[in-house]
């Protein structure tokens, strides 16, 4: 339990930041899930649109420190590869 005034304030700040970060992380997961669902459905246009919406969310989470920058880059890269593979015609 925090005893000093500054420690109590720090605890309050941590709780606020935790809520903000939790919401941001949830938002990122939602956008990534939308891309994955579009890929699973096989709709290339929908997948590309969802990917273009998810990309800045991942970058924002990385810049705010919610995700490590390498993690965000890895997620973007893997999603981009899957979207690209979906848009390439399988008969070519």
From Swiss-Prot:
It comes from the Bacteria. One of its GO terms (molecular function) is structural constituent of ribosome. Coiled coil: none annotated. InterPro entries: Ribosomal_bS20, Ribosomal_bS20_sf. Keywords: Ribonucleoprotein, Ribosomal protein, RNA-binding, rRNA-binding. It holds the Pfam family Ribosomal_S20p. One of its GO terms (cellular component) is cytosol. Residues 1-24 are annotated as: Disordered. GO terms for biological process: translation. Binds directly to 16S ribosomal RNA. Belongs to the bacterial ribosomal protein bS20 family. This is Small ribosomal subunit protein bS20. It comes from Rhizobium etli (strain ATCC 51251 / DSM 11541 / JCM 21823 / NBRC 15573 / CFN 42).
């Amino acid at each position: 339990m925090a005893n000093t005034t500054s420690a109590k304030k720090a605890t309050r700040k941590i709780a606020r930041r935790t809520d903000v970060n939790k919401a941001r992380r949830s938002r990122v997961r939602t956008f990534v899930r939308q891309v994955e669902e579009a890929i699973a459905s096989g709709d290339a246009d929908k997948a590309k649109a969802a990917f273009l919406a998810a990309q800045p969310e991942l970058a924002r989470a990385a810049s705010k420190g919610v995700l490590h920058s390498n993690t965000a880059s890895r997620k973007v890269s893997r999603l981009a590869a899957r979207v690209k593979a979906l848009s390439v015609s399988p008969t070519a």
